Amino acid sequence: MFTELTKQYYRFECGGSVISLRYDMTAFLRLEERGISYEDIFRGRITGAVLCEFLKAGGYPGDPELILHGMGGPVLWTHLRAAVLLALPVRDPLVIDIPGEDPGEADMKRLRGLICDIMRKPEEFFWSSTMRELVERWQAFAIAKGYMKKPERMQMFDTEGME
């Protein structure tokens, strides 16, 4: 998506002069180097340092603080967001967002049912084991019962000196 950015400038007036902003990925890279993540930027945790970094990347290295104080943070952030939206490619109206499953916590009911009901292990075993132990136990059980094929083993040989 970021490779299809347009090179359009967003212009706004500040203190009698016209400022031209163009969205640039280097601003985000510089912010990440300073410990400010992309998600923090668009969640609203905007600080003066973030705005100044955007202005520096936009070609205003000498006076970002003056622009920030002249306009105010919220107003400047509105202009920066407009510049980002102007640069992003237009979304295809035929593509519809399909709500996916919440990638939150794992569904432990299914896993507990697999371990406790199918493998007939006590519930204490399930809750006291790590995920790795549970997967290893399930694989051993499935191979023994014939649900899975036994993985093929490969042996590596040192071919040096065998000639």
Summary of predicted features, one role per range:
Residues 1-163:
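Charged interaction scaffolds used for protein-protein
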